[in-house]
């Protein structure tokens, strides 16, 4: 436990940030799951719409530093490839 006043404030701020980051990570994962679910169901339009909603959220969190930019690019690349494959069939 912190004894210095500024250290106590820092621990409170750190806890608030941790909660916010966890919430945002959860939101991002939920959107990714929606895209994966739509792809696995085989619904072309639903998967494309879900992907369009997911993309700006992932980009936003990558620019803010919640996830690494390469991880964001990887998510988008893999899911867009699967959607393109779904549209070919």
Swiss-Prot record:
The keyword Ribonucleoprotein applies. One of its GO terms (biological process) is translation. The keyword Ribonucleoprotein applies. One of its GO terms (molecular function) is small ribosomal subunit rRNA binding. GO terms for cellular component: cytosol; small ribosomal subunit. Binds directly to 16S ribosomal RNA. This is Small ribosomal subunit protein bS20. It comes from Buchnera aphidicola subsp. Schizaphis graminum (strain Sg). The gene is rpsT.
């Amino acid at each position: 436990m912190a004894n210095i006043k500024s250290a106590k404030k820092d621990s409170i701020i750190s806890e608030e940030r941790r909660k916010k980051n966890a919430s945002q990570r959860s939101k991002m994962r939920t959107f990714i799951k929606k895209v994966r679910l739509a792809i696995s169901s085989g619904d072309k339009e639903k998967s494309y719409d879900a992907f369009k909603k997911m993309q700006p959220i992932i980009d936003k969190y990558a620019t803010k530093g919640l996830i690494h930019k390469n991880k964001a690019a990887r998510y988008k690349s893999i899911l867009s490839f699967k959607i393109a494959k779904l549209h070919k069939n």
